[in-house]
Amino acid sequence: GIANPLSVRWDARGRMFVACSDVYPQIEPGVMPDDKVIMLEDKNTDGYADKSSVFASGLNIPTGMEVGIDGVYVGHNTELLHFDWNGNRKLLLSGFGNGDSHQTMNSFAWSPGGELWFCQGDGVESRVETPFGVSSLFQAGVYRLRPDELKLDPLLDDFMGPGNPWGVAFDDYGQSFVIDGAGGVSYLTPASIPAKRRLRLPRIGKPGGYCGIDCLGASNLPAEMAGDFLIGDYIFDCKKNALIINKEFQNIYILQLNLNKEYEQIRKKILH
């Protein structure tokens, strides 16, 4: 069944994939992790899942997951894995940091250019062997992966941006933004080219406890909200567990989602 869901995605057939963890937040001595990705299907198209199956197993706290054209990408512990649609498992990259299970690679998101972006917090250090050499990220930052060639670019190392990033989003112009679990939103685009000169990105808006971000643009939303940010706020009570912040950060709209305070929101996504 579904236990401690960490990530949810849908494929083009409407199937839901849920990354779950029984051992979160850490493994007990002598225990072999067997976390799973559960696939839920609506066979009779009534809007409710009527079939549940294990798509992937043998995982260790899968904090990152994203559906691609050729299968599902899963980040767990120190490894980035790929599962084809038959569930066959392939190790793509290893060497990601696992010093803190709350800050391991997370918040997988596709860019408009077909790159896979994901975050890591400042409690881990990564040294990943790639076909292009070692890709290192020693503190909080963002990774950009080109899956076809396994080129992995580390961005925002050495506290250039958020200390605990948990979400990346793109607007209609392809600009990138990152959300901080202990801060606000940072404009990520200026740091999209790896550089040796370390300049800290300015923070957009007020600091807070945020997790998950999306840029609004769905046609079923008011036109004046286009380009605004939808973010999760996990610090306060359930009366303030999602916010819509406009582009100029002048107005904040509080959404009531009626979520249990024991569950933190990880990713915000508006379905078009």
Functional labels for PLM-detected ranges:
Residues 1-272:
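Beta-propeller domains with acidic blade repeats across secreted/periplasmic ectodomains
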